[in-house]
Design a protein with these regions (language model features):
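Glycine-rich phosphate/adenosyl-contacting loop at the front of the ribokinase-like
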Residues: 1-70, 74, 92
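Conserved phosphate-binding/catalytic region of the ribokinase-like
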Residues: 3, 194, 198-310
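A glycine-rich helix N-cap at a beta->alpha junction
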Residues: 71-86
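Conserved phosphate-binding/catalytic loop of the ribokinase/pfkB sugar-kinase fold
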Residues: 84, 94-132, 137
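Structural alpha-helical scaffold elements that stabilize or flank donor/cofactor-binding regions
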Residues: 125-126, 173-174, 213
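Conserved beta-alpha-beta core of the PfkB/ribokinase-like small-molecule kinase fold
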Residues: 132-206, 227-228
């Protein structure tokens, strides 16, 4: 059944200035509304590498909810386990500056408690034959527990990402059961109660290696924007993955694409360094387009011997 992705769906409302952005002032520009959410983006990114993921999540019981399901279906994502419920989708409102970076954002999270019952009733069917699990860590605590129980039952690897680190901090103890956790530099600072914003990759790599050992986290990757990413494992292996040099149009979804690429690599036999390299390529492909997901690739472009199933 491919990689199972579990998480929330958002509607992204994005504003772009037509001239020089004035913080605190009125800015003429354009406003776009697109399907978003970390996990939804990750599922579509995986599908765009001609793999066939399964998305487990919720959408609104409205026309917009149907649109989300239809788009995922068009990208060959298995949507059998998406439920339509009231308040099933969140909203993310973001303002971008002239460099394509988010300068202000606010989000309304959806009610994801119906996922608990969904996993109770269909968890065995969802996880039994999957290749691995990609989990949004800031879901309901019970949903995270259920997922980890099924992963242990069926011997599946679990890879985690966050959309709200403040909420994910309440699930910090679960990181010891996660095969690889991916977050950005700011989120890593919150996780370890420190400020890493001034660190260069070499120093960040050393700090991360020490932290994963002391916190007993099996594996962790920290993205650092245009400085690339660093990774570290509890066994002492660590390294740096340089960023790809591309012209920035819109950074939305770059972190999600990096996570998707890393999960793809780790699931289908690549080393952690090779997997992060796939993530870096997918992230670069998102940054230089207006979409918040990567364009189409084939597995062989990343050295993956995975059959493409139509």
């Amino acid at each position: 059944m491919g990689i199972v992705v579990i998480g929330a769906v958002f509607v992204d409302i994005k504003g772009y200035p037509l001239s020089t952005y004035i913080p605190g002032g009125r800015n003429a520009g354009r406003v776009e509304q697109v399907h978003g959410g970390v996990s939804r983006n990750v599922a579509e990114d995986i599908a765009n590498v001609e793999l066939r993921p399964t998305f487990v999540g919720l959408v609104d019981d409205t026309g917009m909810g149907l649109d989300v399901i239809e788009k995922l279906n068009n990208h060959k994502v298995n949507t059998r386990f998406i439920q339509r419920v009231p308040d099933g989708m969140g909203t993310w409102l973001a303002i971008f500056n002239n460099d394509g970076d988010v300068c202000a954002a606010i989000s309304k999270r959806p009610d994801t408690t119906p996922l608990i019952r969904l996993l109770e009733e269909q968890g065995n069917e969802i996880f039994r034959d999957c290749d691995s699990i990609a989990l949004e860590l800031d879901l309901e605590k019970e949903t995270v527990k259920q997922t980890l129980r099924y992963a242990k039952k069926y011997g599946k690897k679990v890879y985690a990402v966050v959309s709200n680190m403040s909420i994910a901090m309440e699930r910090r103890d679960f990181l010891q059961q996660i095969d690889c956790f991916v977050c950005n530099q700011q989120e890593a600072g919150l996780l370890f109660s420190d400020d890493y914003g001034h660190l260069e990759p070499e120093e960040m790599c050393r700090v991360l290696a020490a932290n994963v050992r002391s916190a007993n986290i099996p594996c962790m990757v920290v993205t650092m924007g245009d400085k690339g990413a660093v990774y570290a494992q509890a066994d002492g292996d660590c390294g740096i993955v340089p960023a790809k040099k591309v012209d920035v149009i819109d950074t939305t979804g770059a972190g999600d694409a990096f996570f998707a690429g890393t999960v793809i690599g780790l699931t289908y036999g690549k080393t952690l360094a090779e997997s992060c390299e796939i993530g870096s390529r997918l992230a670069a492909s998102v940054i230089c387009i207006t979409e918040n997901v990567c364009p189409r690739f084939r597995p062989l472009e990343f050295g993956l011997d995975v059959p493409v199933v139509d």
